[in-house]
Amino acid sequence: MFKGLYTVATGMIAQQRKTEIITNNMANANTPGFKADQSTIRSFPDMLLSAVGNTNIPVDKKINAPFIQEIGAVNTGIYLQETLANHAQGSLIETNKTTDIALIDGLFPIDEESGNSGAIFFRLEHPDGGEAYTRNGNFTLDPEGYLVNGNGYYVLSDTGERIIVPNDNFVVSGDGTVSVDDVEVATLGVSFSLNPALLVKQDNGLFQTVDGTNLASAFNQEGVTFGFKQNFLEGSNVDSAKSMTDLLTAYRAFEANQKVLQAYDKSMEKAVNEIGRV
């Protein structure tokens, strides 16, 4: 009886967390460069129940022999195993702003361990040291003329330097070269991660490595191709229709577990109030 209560409770907790993840995805459906989170639910390891006892052997000396009888497997519930970002490219949105730049995915090698494709990101200077990474190319110029993102983090060049321009009248070519009046100023920095699932997702569409080390440059990486498009932004890759369906499914699963919990509660109430009187 109580084992069933614990199993139902794990199901409700898992579905609640899944609902929170889907809701956050839907809230960021219009956030540039946002990567939708995907959750994985799995069951806890099953337990094998066995009955242990003694049996009398009908002989003259009445020998008691122990026995073990397998009853069967019991599931102990489910849990939300992990949450991973979906790094598929979002659709392009034209903004006609020179400071808006979109990364265009090309070909990436496949990670042998995970079986997933790699991913590329803009390089940003993190104020706490090291680098942060993003797909949100909604950049601006600070008062000093440095190219920064919405958080005020400096956008880095391929050499790891801050990019400064006199005004927003600059041109970004398809290979990432930043030019002012036909004079090359810098090349936008892009980093490559062979297994982006290992990156830590932070607020405002930022990513960092687990140990704080910097990712390798995507330029001159074997098997890596990509491009840039100025006056465009990469939109969120959230599928609103699918997210709504998944949200309803998670809600129904939570509701079903809730009804089972109510049935257990009624059975316990009868056991205490009715059977106890006898």
Language-model-detected regions and their locations in the chain:
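Amphipathic alpha-helical polymerization modules
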Residues: 1-278
